[in-house]
Every structure is written in structure tokens, then in C-alpha cells.
Amino acid sequence: MYIVLSHIWNIVRTQQKKRMLIVDEAWQLMKYDDSANFMFSLAKRARKYYLGLTTITQDVEDFMGSKMGRAIVSNSSMQLLLKQSSSAVDVLGDVFKLTEEERKRLANFPVGQGLFFAGQNHVHIQIVASDTETGLITTNPQATLQQAAAAAAEEQT
């Protein structure tokens, strides 16, 4: 993952144009000092090269457990937090200065609801995905099998 990102970063710096880099499972990079420092440097310098950076992780505690991870989150212009474990809510409550009500909500949000942060402002949001979007992003094994079966049936006709 680090090698691929490093290669992408080299391309971004030599061929400047507006782009968005999405790093899924970013917590994996935060486990090691070298890759965490690389991500932090990337986050700090991306804008200079017309690059938007989005980091995604399911377990924010792994990300926030790193000094560099905390710095990346703190320096981000926007954050989106979906349902979190109670222990993660405690950490996030301190970092994001959450109210008691926001802490409760964050621990109990249903799928598609979360807190969106832009600067000092934070609001409760509901994300509604279209059927096409849901098909692309679902991680539900049963839904994935149904999609595969439907696609196979469509190919048969």
C-alpha cells in the first residue's frame, strides 16, 4: 500500500492537475512510523499539488492511536463520523469536543447516519444512497450474492 501511494505521490507532483486521492483502510498505514509519517506529509502537502486527500477507516481508534493519525484528523478541513464503538466515542469526544448528546448519537447511529464536521461546525446527517450506489458500496455478503445472482440471470437472458 505504501509503495503504491508513494508512486501515486510521485505522479501527482510531476503532473499537476486537480485530483482526488482516496486511501481506504488508512489505519494500516498508521501502524508503522514510516508510513504514518508519509501519510502526514501527504496530508500536509497535497493541496499544494491540487490534490484532495480522503482517508477512510472503519475503526477510528486504530487511526487515532497514532500521533500522526491524530494530526491528520485535526488538520482535515472536513470529517465524517459514522457509528462508533463506545470506547472510540470517548476518544473522539475529546478530539472533536462533542456534546454529551453527540456522544450518545455517535454510539447509536443506524446505518447511513453520522456527524459531519466542517471547521468548527458539526451537524447530524442522513446519507441516502441510490440503488446503484448501494450496489457499489455494500459490504453485506448476502446483498453481494444477490447482486451476483441477478447479474448471472441477466447474462442468461
Segments (PLM) and residue ranges:
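Conserved P-loop NTPase motor cores
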Residues: 1-105, 131
